[in-house]
Amino acid sequence: MKISDAKFDIALANSGLTIGQAAERAGISRVRYAAILNQKRVTPQAAGKIAKGVGVTVEQIIETED
């Protein structure tokens, strides 16, 4: 599973939050949040934390395979 940079950026912009604020909402440190975003592949649990931070579903921020 990979988080789409473009989809995440849109979700973050729509939320009006900073990365630090999104990390706080997700219950993890800003450093850990950023590290997850920079990974090539993420676990479903990590994707869930990232999505929770910006208030969207996982489906809204992951890259889909066609």
What does each model-found stretch correspond to?
Residues 55-66:
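Short C-terminal boundary/hinge segments that cap the last helix of small helical domains
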Residues 1-21, 63:
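A short, Lys/Arg-rich alpha-helix, primarily the initiator
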Residues 39-52:
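Short, basic-rich loop-to-helix N-cap that marks the start of a DNA-contacting helix
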Residues 9, 34-35, 48, 62:
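Key DNA-contacting residues within the recognition helix of helix-turn-helix
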Residues 27-42:
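Recognition helix of helix-turn-helix/homeodomain-like DNA-binding domains
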Residues 21-23, 50:
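Short alpha-helical "recognition helix" segments of helix-turn-helix
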